Amino acid sequence: MYRPEIKRKKSGAPVLSRKEIDVIGQNIVGDFMPEALKSPQEIDIDLLAQDYLGMDQDFQYLSHCGVYLGMTVFNDTDKVPVYDPQNNCADYISAKAHTVIIDKMLLEENQEHRYRFTMGHEAGHEFLHKEYFAYDPDQITLFDLMGETPAPMVQCRVDTKKMDCRTSKSWTDRDWMEWQANALSSAVLMPVSMVRMVAENFKRPGLHQIFCHYALAEEVASVFNVSFEAAGYRLKQLGYIPQEAQLSTDILNMISFDLACNY
């Protein structure tokens, strides 16, 4: 399996730029699914997590209100917090290390894109952050001397996709790792070289520029089976759509209807 050299803080948290994460994502895809770097296509994120990274997959309700979408378990534990809808109460279950738990809400209709991004996010935690969270029970550490143990898991909230590096001065290691997991999910689901191939081969002659932005984001979303929002963000990040451009799914629906009538 591909193993990049990653600079880390003393805590074990990685220090990575967006460009470095793009390289890591591209190399993961190249090692796992080489054909996906020859022609743009959907990445099988379930197969990557389970077969390539060796993660076990589980589905639970992680909260009563959908605030948590996914969870990565790094150490064996019998204290995984879940929600029991039948009894309307919190509960605990057991899970082994290297388990990814996805909220059952994401198995519902029209949730495929959120599911795929969340699986990519949790796979990102597994690939990048084991050194920070993992605990060797055969070694005595400072945690043992203090009567504590490291957190056995990381819970991922629904709002982390909105994290912006421009506010990063006050970020903790955990904040940075959420951002890194988001960035790696994007880099794996939409490998940089393949997004560039789609964008540079995309042509809609006679179409107004703002409509071109919408059409390009819709094309990327379709090719890689990701959300329109994720595709637009990726294209902005790579410079194909201006950062200040506002992309609305409501306007997309109107434009898509108009394009269907004219092409």
Feature locations, PLM:
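Active-site hotspot residues in diverse enzymes, especially metal/ion-binding acidic/histidine motifs
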Residues: M1-Y263
